[in-house]
Amino acid sequence: MVDTTITVFILVMMFILGAVFGSFACCQAWRWRYHALKKKDLGQWSVCLHCKKRIKWYDNIPIISWLVLRGKCRNCHKEIGIADFLSELSLGVAFLMLSWAYLVPILNNWSVLALHPEFLALRLAIFIVTLMLLVVLMVLAVYDAKWGELPTVLL
């Protein structure tokens, strides 16, 4: 049995990783939209949709920045929108729950699983593929929620 501190640390890190991928999902949805509209002015940095100012790195921290700024741009004080916050939060929670379902049993049964590395590898592969699938589904969900359609860039 693994120490509770390690388990909590892993679960917190997986929540943070999920929030980061939730932020990525929103950015990717916008990139697909720009690609679908054949717009070329999509830069490398996140910008406010209203004032077009570049968002600083410390205003781009998933969940925390949205809460600190109360869902508004630091420069023009216009609403950012709750979709970004919700995707970060929901993917963070989803990563946490999947980690609880897949990783905690692995950590708690490490001595047994070490005798069967093929089972351990299979369980970890299923876990990673499930996380990747969740990220893709979140990108599609954000795209659908914002524009009421699915991107043709996937076809």
What is the meaning of each model-derived region?
Residues M1-L155:
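A membrane-topology feature that recognizes alpha-helical transmembrane segments
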